[in-house]
Regions:
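Non-catalytic beta-sheet/beta-sandwich ligand-binding modules that flank or precede catalytic cores
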Residues: 1-201
Length: 201
């Protein structure tokens, strides 16, 4: 959010929040600090890259003598914010055709981010039924790792990334922690059949 200050050249009693033209977001917390100074909070639209623009057109309010304002096109009568409130997402894929792992099997996982990130790390990944190794940043949007199922186990291997684990260059944290493409599940059977005991001669 950003706090905006509207400074009038003369006192006015009829300058109100509705006099401000707002795109790409909304105003709140409108406050008359004095008859010439007003403040408000600008909040950009969620999940958007549309610039936020706040301005006041001419003839929106008047001074004590009844003269209406006339600087609707002046440069200091408009503020523009570059906005990026789009939260990055992630998709996880694997190289195993049937998602079934036996003793000695491993699978290469690929984590594909919708936006570049510099703080996505292995510890952001939630793992059960096995472990990750060989973490590799192929690029700022693609990461790979090797999943190894737990030995002597029939517990499914599950790999996922929860929301709010990493962020993009604008500081937006990731979302879609519960999306279907944000989790991979392996059927695991790494139990081994014991070798038969030799028969007595």
């Amino acid at each position: 959010t950003s706090t905006l200050t509207f400074t009038l050249s003369e006192a006015a009693t009829d300058f109100v929040e509705a006099d401000a033209t707002v795109t790409g977001g909304s105003l709140s917390n409108w406050t008359a600090v004095s008859s010439t100074v007003y403040t408000a909070t600008f909040t950009p639209t969620a999940d958007s890259t549309t610039d936020g623009v706040i301005s006041v057109s001419s003839s929106k309010f008047s001074g004590s003598s009844g003269n209406t304002n006339n600087d609707g096109s002046d440069a200091n009568n408009s503020i523009t914010f570059t906005v990026d409130t789009v939260r990055p997402t992630i998709a996880i894929t694997d190289d195993d055709d049937d998602n079934s792992l036996s003793a000695g099997d491993t699978s290469t996982l690929t984590f594909t981010l919708s936006e570049a990130s510099t703080n996505f790390v292995q510890s952001d990944v939630t793992i059960s039924g096995g472990s990750l190794s060989n973490w590799n940043a192929v690029s700022s949007t693609v990461y790979t790792a090797t999943f190894t199922p737990t030995a002597d186990s029939t517990t499914d291997g599950v790999i996922s990334v929860a929301s709010s684990k990493f962020s993009d260059s604008a500081g937006n944290s990731n979302t879609d922690g519960s999306d279907a493409n944000n989790s991979v599940t392996f059927t695991v059977d790494t139990t081994t059949t014991p070798s038969p005991s030799p028969s007595p001669s």
